[in-house]
Amino acid sequence: SGTAANELTMLALTHLYPEGGEIITPPLTWISDINSVLFANFEPVFVDINKNNLSFDLDKLENSITDKTRAIFVTHVLGLNALSDRLLKICKDRDIKLIEDVCESHGAMFNDTKLGSIGFASNFSFYFAHHMSTIEGGMISTNDNHFYQLCRALRSHGMTRELTDKDMRQQYIDEHPDLNPDFIFMGPAHNFRSNEINAVLGL
């Protein structure tokens, strides 16, 4: 589900930031965005929206960034693009990861680019009331291979055999020579695996 995608994204971020930190999120969003931050033991920092695209008030957002800010979790509400050149510059200049919630905005664009292909990671929902449905379903997209590998494993109980990066998988095997390589778990995780039947419905 989109909720599972949110939770998995935040769980994977805990492997990048084991010390924790803050996630900036808008108050106008779905509850699973906020819950996913809390479940991962990050601290949500709420920044109010503007009235034009229901995204962050960027002046308030800049004033809310601290040295503990790990990501900006933006929600594209009701098909509206929440991005701007200024927001992307803030993320780039401060080296803060941008997470996109695209659950309500499949197909929307920013500067001729599809939403969900711009941030560090993006979450989609295939709930029956959304643009594309698998009845229930979700997806994470990212261009970062390490983050992708984390998501692959953490969506399947944390099993390192799910890793397609051979070097990353071998590292776990080398660290645990006394364990069966097919049953090494990287830590607490979930079973968020989808199935082919749902995928067919989406097609």
Predicted features along the sequence, with ranges:
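Structured binding elements
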Residues: 41
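Active-site region of PLP-dependent enzymes
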Residues: 105-111, 118-203
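Hydrophobic alpha-helical segments that mediate membrane insertion or helix-helix packing
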Residues: 5, 23-25, 126, 138
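Conserved coil-to-alpha-helix start sites within the AMP-binding
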Residues: 3, 28-34
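Active-site phosphate-binding strand-loop segment of PLP-dependent enzymes
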Residues: 52-149
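Hydrophobic/aromatic ligand-binding patch that stacks against planar heteroaromatic rings
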Residues: 35-37, 90
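Phosphate-binding glycine-rich loop
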Residues: 1-22, 38, 46-48
